[in-house]
């Protein structure tokens, strides 16, 4: 094989590789953002590059999923509550919106009796709180779709206040979350799964825990797209 043919062959192989990568990175398929795909570890440099591209505002929807019944629960809130803001420089990495209505569904609180002791929590269903995210860490890339990356959520926290008691301090519900998710760098779409791992009722500004909130096994699923 002469030099010209070798050169043409190398060019053809290069274009084939580029084309296959482009095809793999043009998918906009929800199946690429589940946990059935195969993921390969990425370098810290690649993870940092993705992190630096994230700051901005995202909007979409959130629902509660119960793995024991395989049912989804959607909020009846009239407010536009489903958004995520990731900051470039801030003490808290980012904020996810969460409505009281969704929170009640998450913990299935109406069947636990907590609503008898903290009534205000359940009378203002349209009120919102923020899940404060401490950070997310990208760990791997989808081998079937190179646009999709998996990440871990280090920790999140949400508080809902209740001022219905005639006491100097207000009561509140607090839930801690961890979880994981997927991010498509081409479409700027997040899919985030947040699992409560601790929840309790407390008096504001007090460190003593006053009661545990039962964990139901349900978790939050956010599907969000970058808008700015």
Predicted feature descriptions by range:
Residues 1-9, 18-50, 54, 228:
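Bacterial Sec-dependent N-terminal signal peptides
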Residues 35-43, 170-228:
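Edge beta-strand at a domain terminus
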């Amino acid at each position: 094989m002469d030099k010209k043919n070798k050169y043409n062959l190398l060019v053809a192989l290069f274009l084939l590789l580029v084309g296959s990568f482009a095809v793999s990175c043009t998918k906009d398929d929800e199946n690429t953002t589940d946990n059935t795909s195969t993921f390969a570890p990425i370098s810290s440099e690649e993870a940092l590059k993705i992190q630096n591209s994230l700051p901005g505002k995202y909007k979409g929807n959130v629902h509660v999923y119960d793995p024991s019944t395989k049912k989804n629960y959607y909020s009846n809130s009239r407010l536009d509550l489903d958004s995520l803001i990731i900051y470039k420089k801030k003490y808290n990495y980012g904020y996810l919106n969460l409505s009281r209505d969704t929170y009640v569904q998450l913990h299935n609180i109406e069947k636990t009796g907590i609503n008898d002791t903290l009534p205000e929590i359940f009378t203002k269903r349209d009120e919102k709180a923020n899940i404060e995210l401490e950070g997310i860490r990208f760990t791997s890339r989808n081998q079937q779709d190179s646009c999709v990356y998996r990440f871990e959520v280090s920790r999140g926290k949400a508080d809902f206040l209740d001022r219905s008691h005639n006491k100097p301090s207000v009561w509140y519900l607090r839930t801690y979350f961890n979880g994981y998710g997927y991010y498509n760098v081409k479409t700027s779409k997040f899919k985030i799964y947040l699992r409560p791992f601790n929840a309790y009722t407390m008096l504001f500004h007090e460190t003593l825990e006053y009661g545990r909130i039962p964990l139901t096994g349900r978790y939050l699923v956010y599907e969000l797209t970058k808008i700015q």
